[in-house]
Amino acid sequence: HTGGTLDKFDSIPGYNTKPDLETFKKVVKDVGCAIIGQTSNLAPADKKLYSIRDVVGTVESLPLITSSILSKKIASGLSSLVLDVKVGNGSFNSTIDIARDLSNSLVRVAKGAGLHCEAILTDMNQVLGKSAGHTLEILECIKYIKNDFKDHRLEKITNELISSLLVNIYKISKEEAYNKINTVINNGLAAEKFEMMVAALGGPRNILSSFEKDLINTSVRKDVFCNKEGWIEKIHTRELGLILIELG
């Protein structure tokens, strides 16, 4: 409820989340990765289908959700896919049963289309990481990839998703996959690739060293303190997300 991945990247000045197909291919070839969104040439029918779903009240239709998610993935030519399916009060999948149904549908249809697919259910009953808000989340990601700060839950989920993809592609063990992840984080290669990708897609060229200057900082800050001792038992994550939307 705080926006998607592309909304986060839109907070990076100049970053283009919707490049043309040739630019997308070039960035992937030169850098090795590109975080982008749907373009008019990639699964063009999906946008029209979604608008129809909205009008006829089938936004929550499982088959249509499945086709919407997978159409873009399959059209981009993937050979392997790992999906992070959220479940909890901050997700559209409010219960584990709903999330399982969606996961099973996604995996079944993907495999039917010849795409190796795995879905991992992850908890969204609390904020992932220590930040909430587009720019703040990008800042935390930069600190993570620079190995300056890692939230335990964020690291665990990130490693699980990446390791599953590495196991699927390279046919290696989980332990070997974890070692590969730790190596590229510790030697700075992951950070270097991130910086190259941001620059190639129109963002700042030295974002790792100048991110505090390049990313927009708010002029208004307010600390909110707890007025009594105790443990946090539950977080209404959806309400927190809606508050952020109201704040802009």
Residue ranges and their predicted role:
Residues 8, 27, 72-73, 109:
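Hydrophobic/aromatic ligand-binding patch that stacks against planar heteroaromatic rings
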Residues 1-25, 29, 36-38, 97:
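A glycine-rich phosphate/pyrophosphate-binding beta-strand-loop-alpha-helix module
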Residues 1-4, 34-47, 76-86, 117-120:
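Core alpha/beta catalytic barrel or barrel-like domain that forms the active/cofactor pocket
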Residues 58-60, 65, 75, 79-248:
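Well-ordered secondary-structure scaffolds
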Residues 24, 69, 106:
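Aromatic/hydrophobic pocket-lining residues that form π-stacking "cages" and hydrophobic walls in ligand
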Residues 29-76:
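Phosphate/diphosphate-binding glycine-rich loops and adjacent basic-rich segments that engage nucleotide
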Residues 1-2, 24-26, 42-43, 89-90, ...:
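Short gly/pro/ser/thr-enriched loop/turn and capping motifs at secondary-structure boundaries
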Residues 3-10, 39-40, 46-50, 92-97, ...:
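Short acidic, glycine/serine/threonine-rich loops at helix termini
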